Amino acid sequence: MELYLDTANVAEVERLARIFPIAGVTTNPSIVAASKESIWDVLPRLQNAIGEEGTLFAQTMSRDAKGMVEEAKRLNNAIPGIVVKIPVTAEGLAAIKLLKKEDIVTLGTAVYSASQGLLAALAGAKYVAPYVNRVDAQGGDGIRMVQELQTLLEHHAPDSMVLAASFKTPRQALDCLLAGCQAITLPLDVAQQMLNTPAVESAIEKFEQDWKNAFGNLNL
């Protein structure tokens, strides 16, 4: 299983990378824009924060296949080994096919249906990113869509994997993993929710109080 953080906040990546067994960092245009930094400045800093073995993802901005391919090459030249995120539109599928021939690794993003995700995988995307909470917000069933996509990839595109995105709660992320999803990317607030468990803190405080009452200190 691969766990990613969905952010361009370098300081938070450095903090959480010490705690979480993360495989890397995913970004998108909105996330980079929120950082107020040039993508060409923030990407090297993010790569440094996750180390050489960490995988970094960044998205193209062009709407046409030719522009997507050109931007993907620029990203790959700047950060060798970067995974380029391509929106799964008609032009995006064409770009994914071309980038596959160039040996540039891609992720099909903005996936709202299992059939859309399957097309991205068949075109050559290594990763496919279904938007779980956004599907729910539109009246769909994000987890069911992930289950369907996971099954389709297992049968028809085994070299590709689901990298589920767009979570609002830890429960959504866990449900994706239970559905067989091999990778997820968490926004910072959801990652932090996984760490903030009041019941755990209460249990630890009780242990400490009992120990201190018995021995007068908190040392072993």
From Swiss-Prot:
GO terms for molecular function: fructose 6-phosphate aldolase activity. The lineage of its organism: Bacteria, Pseudomonadati, Pseudomonadota, Gammaproteobacteria, Enterobacterales. It holds the Pfam family TAL_FSA. GO terms for biological process: fructose metabolic process. Catalyzes the reversible formation of fructose 6-phosphate from dihydroxyacetone and D-glyceraldehyde 3-phosphate via an aldolization reaction. Gene3D superfamilies: Aldolase class I. It is found in: Cytoplasm. Its EC number is 4.1.2.-. Keywords: Carbohydrate metabolism, Cytoplasm, Lyase, Schiff base. Its main location: cytoplasm. The keyword RNA-binding does not apply. The active site is at residue 85. This is Fructose-6-phosphate aldolase. Homodecamer. It comes from Salmonella agona (strain SL483). It is an enzyme of class 4 (lyase).
